[in-house]
Amino acid sequence: MNLNFMPLLHAYNHVSIDFHFNSSARDFCVHEVPLYEFSNTGEHAVIQVRKSGLSTLEMLQIFSQILGVKIAELGYAGLKDKNALTTQFISLPKKYAPLLEKNTSNFQERNLKILSLNYHHNKIKLGHLKGNRFFMRFKKMTPLNAQKTEQVLEQIAQFGMPNYFGSQRFGKFNDNHKEGLKILQNETKFAHQKLNAFLISSYQSYLFNSLLSKRLEISKIISAFSVKESLEFFKQKNLSVHSNALKALKNQAHPFKILEGDVMRHYPYGKFFDALELEKESERFLNKEAVPTGLLDGKKALYAKNLSLEIEKGFQHNLLSGHAKTLGSRRFFWVFVENITSQYIKEKAQFELEFYLPKGSYASALLKEIKHEKGENNDEF
């Protein structure tokens, strides 16, 4: 497989929208929404921290240096962008809590501010978040492009958007996935096991993005062309599908088509299940109750069936399925953007956008869908 970045398809068909976005603390804000309420009792102090110009790992190092706490004792739910103003929750042993207020000025000098202090009975672990609220400010936006952006946001609010992995997964030089494959091929290896695992997961992410783009291509062909023309496309790709099945797919109201053999999952949390009745599942998808999922290949991954599997096979890798430490999983192909609010400030030529995404989804995917720039499958923020 060619590991260079290929263009990823968009969900919607508008022309490119021109504006400027700068990933900075002024124009990009991320606020973490915790998975559960904190009990205000327990052996772990839980602090809400606001940071700017720092990665989450850099922030943890500062806490370790100032408080004397070991980094391994600090808990966090996820990594937040460096080039943004972000808030997130951090846990640490209760005994360090008295040192927090004493070091307020030391934290502020490092672009950190503690917003709240609570307590809980367990340490915060990776994944212990519900999602994130985002704020983005677009600049150099004309009134016409603001109107176009509003129209795109209406479509996204109704149907959702592709759940692509963002550029954070692929690194500054867009080559993390290549390093991950080299690790699987025993061509290279790093001393830190977590780094090896992350790079392998980047390769999984690359395959997922490529599979999702292929599924979008198929969905667009089904929607745009006649049954006869679509049959010819499937024939050329050596994919088995009958004309009656294509007619049913064409009747699905959602722009992303559910195929025979898809693995569905209740949204936003829930069990996986097979798509047995496509008409029924397409309605549930339209109602944001269940979503088709894509493969993150690994030793214990759940695979699709029938037509969906025929397509998925092109994005599997035997080194992933045979790798003892790479268990594999599935990820929502699609995600629904919630609580979208926006305003256009004409005198400043600025467009302000706020929205919520569940954990694991990227604001850069929304930016990509709005801008519709023809480029590679990484976004420059």
UniProtKB/Swiss-Prot annotation:
Keywords: Isomerase, tRNA processing. It catalyses: uridine(13) in tRNA = pseudouridine(13) in tRNA. Its EC number is 5.4.99.27. SUPFAM superfamilies: Pseudouridine synthase (SSF55120). It is an enzyme of class 5 (isomerase). It holds the Pfam family TruD. CDD domains: PseudoU_synth_EcTruD. The active site is at 81 (nucleophile). InterPro entries: PsdUridine_synth_cat_dom_sf, PsdUridine_synth_TruD, PsdUridine_synth_TruD_CS, PsdUridine_synth_TruD_insert, TruD_catalytic, TruD_pseudoU_synthase. One of its GO terms (biological process) is tRNA pseudouridine synthesis. GO terms for cellular component: cytosol. GO terms for molecular function: RNA binding; tRNA pseudouridine(13) synthase activity. Residues 160-335 form the TRUD domain. Belongs to the pseudouridine synthase TruD family. NCBIfam families: PRK00984.1-3, tRNA_TruD_broad. Responsible for synthesis of pseudouridine from uracil-13 in transfer RNAs. This is tRNA pseudouridine synthase D. It comes from Helicobacter pylori (strain J99 / ATCC 700824). The lineage of its organism: Bacteria, Pseudomonadati, Campylobacterota, Epsilonproteobacteria, Campylobacterales. The gene is truD.
